[in-house]
A protein has these predicted regions:
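Bacterial Sec-dependent N-terminal signal peptides
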Residues: 1-24, 438, 523
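C-terminal outer-membrane/trafficking sorting elements
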Residues: 18-21, 441-450, 454-523
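Middle-to-C-terminal accessory/interaction subdomains
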Residues: 24-29, 33-36, 46, 55, ...
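Short beta-strand/loop motifs in extracellular/secreted proteins, especially
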Residues: 61-63, 96-98, 149, 466-470
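Conserved oxyanion/phosphate-binding beta-strand-loop segments in alpha/beta enzyme cores
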Residues: 63-121
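Internal "kinase-insert"/substrate-recognition segments embedded within catalytic cores
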Residues: 97-107, 121-122, 141-146, 158-267, ...
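A conserved alpha-helical element in kinase catalytic cores
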Residues: 123-143
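Short, well-structured beta-strand/strand-turn elements
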Residues: 141-152, 272
Length: 523
């Protein structure tokens, strides 16, 4: 199967070229894989007790910050610091996950244009790099994810631990990753600790209050309008199968979403929409009027979160090494409807096979793991607050680690062994040579248009066809309709407002093959 070219991968290339002249905000922290030094000085006595006391209220505390990256050392007075996380808060010592807000107390204060940084404590991860590797592969594969790096963190002169630094999903992320920040950005709710409010994209009615525990609006908070998200969920849940199939590509960036789902499945990353129905963002892009999917919180990738529930590694009754490509928990209507559609599921398999061939394999991922291991080894050894031993760290790069019961216990899969085992299983489940490639699909066949004459609506049906450009022109040659559908084989076009007369349909596919047909509107 030939490698496909994807919008985000191309965007990343052009942004890289542009950056010769103009840097993206955050490049000092995230451009190169490096280990930052973060030195926080708190002036309160018993500062950590205060941090813990503020955990439930998410209140920030003041601290002075000295940050060292590959470009130099920078000092910032009075940044805001607070503890964060759900399961990660159960880390058995004081090495908790936390967040820094540069301008919480000093208005406009930023580092390299960045306002906030998140610090993950590598809970349940002897390798100390699960999240970083997962995000690296996702980003390379053209999926929207936060940038990440590593850091040695000091509190009041004491080495607190080795952390993964993760970019905040906010307007600055939208600026560089999507090139649009005017729309609504929603974060999936945590639904942690037994909460029965998963961000499952189920339609619960038209009232915003029915969703406030499930989704949090992160932009345009003053307006606080969830109508667009509710309308999308209405579409997902209440459309006919034909309408869902034909219109989904108009509602969201479908290629990137299918790739995002495929990566969650391959990495058995089920603390996501696929499983727990959390840890994602949805952004309504005002430039395209489409929804875009952003991953979040990848610390349970490589099979550390059980498929189907169950409370910990190995639970849930499903072997995460042998999860089928179309696995999802119940009540995930977006995935259920995609997988129920022959054409959309085929589109998913196309993306799946492309990633399996080019990214999710030992040849691609093992060198990334080795590079990170060599970079962080001495820092991990120096971390006296980590959950696992130095031997566990070394062994978990390639092999499973077992460490008793409780949080972080059970069998934790080795990074390299997980990839090789998962690939071996998936190659036995999917014959990618039998998945028709994009290049083989681009010849349009059996084009139909009916009824003809029409009065209110016309239906277009065809076989094959990728990279389609559909144009309808009136008798004077004026363009009255244009569409670029993907992964569908039918389309309904409302014509009830069009004038009576003769119209010309022109179908062009990516290989340049064109078909035309004349029809009329009579009333």
């Amino acid at each position: 199967m030939k490698t496909r070219k994807h919008t985000l991968a191309l965007m990343a290339f052009f942004i890289g070229v542009t950056n010769v002249f103009a840097q993206i905000e955050g490049d000092k922290i995230f451009k190169n894989t490096q280990i930052l030094t973060i030195e926080l000085t708190f002036h309160q006595t018993s500062f950590f007790d205060s941090l813990e006391a503020n955990y439930l209220t998410a209140e920030y505390m003041k601290a002075d910050l000295v940050l060292t990256d590959s470009t130099g050392t920078y000092s910032y007075p009075e940044v805001g610091v607070r503890l964060k996380g759900n399961s990660t808060y159960n880390h058995p010592n004081n090495k908790k996950a936390f967040k820094i807000d540069f301008n919480e107390y000093v208005s406009g204060q930023k580092h390299d244009g960045i306002k906030k940084l998140n610090f993950s404590n590598n809970f349940k991860d002897p390798s100390m790099m699960r999240e970083k590797v997962f995000f690296d592969v996702c980003k390379a594969a053209g999926v929207l994810v936060p940038r990440s790096n590593f850091a040695n963190v000091y509190f009041n002169g004491t080495l607190w631990g080795f952390y993964t630094v993760v970019e905040q999903i906010d307007d600055q992320f939208l600026d560089w990753a999507i090139l649009d920040d005017d729309g609504n950005l929603f974060k999936a709710g945590d639904n942690f600790g037994g909460s029965n409010t998963p961000a499952d994209l189920v339609y619960y009615g038209s009232t915003a209050s029915d969703y406030t525990d499930r989704y949090e609006l992160k932009t345009n908070e003053d307006v606080n309008d969830m109508t667009d998200l509710i309308d999308f969920m209405d579409f997902v849940n209440n459309s006919t199968s034909a309408n869902f199939e034909s219109q989904l590509f108009n509602k969201m960036e479908l290629n990137e979403y299918l790739r995002s789902v495929a990566l969650d499945n391959m990495f058995s990353n089920f603390d996501s929409y696929t499983g727990s129905a959390r840890n994602y963002y949805m952004y309504h892009n005002m430039s395209t009027d489409k929804w875009e999917w952003v991953k979040w919180d990848g610390n349970e990738a490589f099979g550390s979160y059980p498929a189907g529930g169950g409370g910990g590694p190995g639970g849930g009754g499903n072997n995460v090494l042998t999860i089928d490509p179309d696995y999802h928990d119940a009540d995930r209507p977006l995935l259920e409807n995609i997988f129920a559609s022959t054409s959309l599921y085929h589109a998913y398999l196309l993306e799946y096979c492309d990633i399996l061939e080019n990214y999710f394999n030992s040849s691609y991922i093992d060198p990334i793991i080795d590079s990170h291991y060599n970079l962080i080894k001495s820092s991990v050894y120096a971390d006296n607050n980590k959950m696992y031993t130095d031997a566990d760290f070394d062994n978990n790069i390639s092999s499973n680690v077992s460490s008793g019961s409780g949080p972080g216990g059970g069998t934790i899969y080795g990074l390299k062994s997980f990839i090789s085992s998962r690939v071996s299983y998936l190659e036995g489940e999917i014959d990618c040579d039998d998945i028709v490639s994009v290049e083989d699909m681009d010849k349009v066949e059996n084009l139909e248009l009916f009824p003809n004459p029409a009065s209110e609506q016309i239906t277009l049906k065809w076989e094959n066809g990728v990279g389609l450009d559909i144009k309808i022109l009136d008798s004077k040659g004026v363009l009255v309709y244009q569409n670029n559908p993907e992964y569908i084989n039918s389309l309904n076009v409302d014509v009830d407002s069009w004038a009576t007369g003769i119209y010309h349909l022109v179908f062009t596919s990516s290989n340049g093959t064109a078909k035309s047909q004349t029809f009329s509107i009579l009333r």
